[in-house]
Amino acid sequence: MSLVPDEPSEESLYQHKPELLRSARELFRRGEVIFTLAERDIRAQYKQAVLGIAWALLTPLISLVLLFILAKNVKSFSIGGNVPTILTMYVGLITFGLFGGAIGGGSNSLVANKALMAKSHFPRECFPLSQILGSAFTSLMATVPLAILFTVHGFAPKLTSLWAPLYVAIEIPFMIGLVLLVSSVIVQMRDLQQIIPIVMPLVMLITVLEPLNQEMHKHLVPNARFVLGHGWLRDVYCFVNPMAPIVDNVRSSVLLGFGPQWSTLILGLCGSLVYLVVGFVVFKKLEVNFADLT
C-alpha cells in the first residue's frame, strides 16, 4: 500500500485554526496509514537484531530486574504484603510502559520522518500517533512474561481485572495529547530530545512506586510513609500525572481485587482531556514550521 495518496484531501489538516473533531474524523479515515507506519517501524526495529522480536520480551524483563533491585535496596520503598513483589512491580511497569514507549518513540517521529513528510499529503499527526500502536505491540508482548510470573507464584489475577480496559481507555487521550505536544515542540527545540530519556525514567519510578490509595498502600508498601495522604496534594498529582491513577487502579484491580477508585480516575480523565486539547492545539500551531525539517 502506498503511503502517499494521489492528491490531498479536501479536509486537509494543514490549517492554522485547530478543529479537533474535524481532525479526529480525518485521522480515523486515515487509520490505515497509521497502522502501516506502525508496522513499518516495528519491522525496522527488530529486522537487524540478532534476537529479533525476542527483544520485545527481554526489554521489560530487564527493566523489571532493575526496578526490583531498587525496591529491595531503598528502605522506604520496601514492598511486602501478600502480593509478590515482582508482580507488583511488573504490572505497574507494563501499564506505564505503554505510555513511556509512546512518548519515547513519538517524540522524535517528526524529525525521523522528515523525508517522508516532504512528499506526503496525509495528516502529519499520523507519525507520532503510529508510535502509540508500536508501544501497544510491545506492551502486548510484555504480557507473556506476566503470565509466566502468575504461574510461577501461583497467584491468579482477580476478577476485577476486567476493569483494566477502562483504565487503558483513560490513558489513550493522555498519550495522544502528550505525544503530539512533545513531537511538535521538539521540531523547534531539539534539546528536548536529550531531556525526554532523562525525565521518563524518573516519572516511571515515582508513578510505579507510590500508590495513591491508602488501603492499597498498606498492602503494597507497608513499611513506607503514605506521602500522598493529603487530599489536595493527591488531587493535583492525579490531574498533572494521569498515569498515577491509571497505574494505581490497574494494579489494585489485577492484584488486590479492588474496584475502580472513581475519585482519582475522574481527576486522571480530566487531566488526560486537558493534555489532549493542549497537545492538539500546540501541534496545529507549530505545524506551519514543520517545513523547516525539509
Residue ranges and their predicted role:
Residues 1-294:
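Hydrophobic transmembrane alpha-helices and immediately adjacent juxtamembrane helices
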